Amino acid sequence: GMIRHGVVISTPHYMTKSGPRTKIDPELQEQWSGFDMQNALSKKLEMPTRVLNDAEVHGAGIISGSGYEVVITLGTGLGFAIFYGGSLSPHIEFSHAPVRRATTYDTWIGEHERRRLGNAFWSRRIRAMVDELRPVFMWDRLYIGGGNARCIRQADLDRMGDEVVIVPNAAGVAGGVRAWTLEQYK
């Protein structure tokens, strides 16, 4: 979801009672919109907290701190984060961008589609997505992580370019620690 300075702007998966790909509950949508998650957690836990999305935490654990670095996480849907010079850039809810046949990236490359297509076809789809996004973002380095990154075939990875790196899902743990020193946009 989209979080700015610990405040929820949008969180599509928590606005439904039954999880992803189900109907949005207007009452939950209203309750989450503008919710200061970071402050609420700090008060409840009686300690400082930092609230980021999954791709931002993942990226905190892997970025080099040099240049324009993009992080994509593949799981239930698509996580997305941008870092420039080691600083976290404002969030883009790229997963909700339309991609094909009036569908979003979340749906087009998410877990449901991976299971439906099988890993080989899904992996080619990821390669096509990377090829299409390269001229838009012109990253110095693209990191692909998340639970489904392991499903990308080596043949497809080899065709993505040297600036594309698959990173382990465990990077999120290191990112959780490093997030405390991560510079953010103002």
Label every PLM stretch briefly.
Residues 1, 52, 71-77, 145:
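Short beta-strand segments
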Residues 2-5, 78-81, 151:
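Short, acidic Gly/Pro/Ser/Thr-rich loop/turn segments
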Residues 3-62, 108, 155-176:
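Glycine-rich phosphate-binding loop and adjoining helix at the ATP-binding site
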Residues 30-58, 87-128, 181:
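Glycine-rich phosphate-binding loop plus the immediately following alpha-helix
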Residues 43, 62-66, 71-74, 134-136:
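Solvent-exposed alpha-helices and their adjacent loops that cap or buttress functional pockets
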Residues 49-50, 68-71, 81, 141-142, ...:
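Structural motif
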Residues 67-91:
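Gly/Thr-rich phosphate-binding beta-strand-loop-beta motif of the actin/hexokinase/Hsp70
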Residues 101-143, 147-186:
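Adenine-nucleotide phosphate-binding core of ATP-dependent small-molecule kinases
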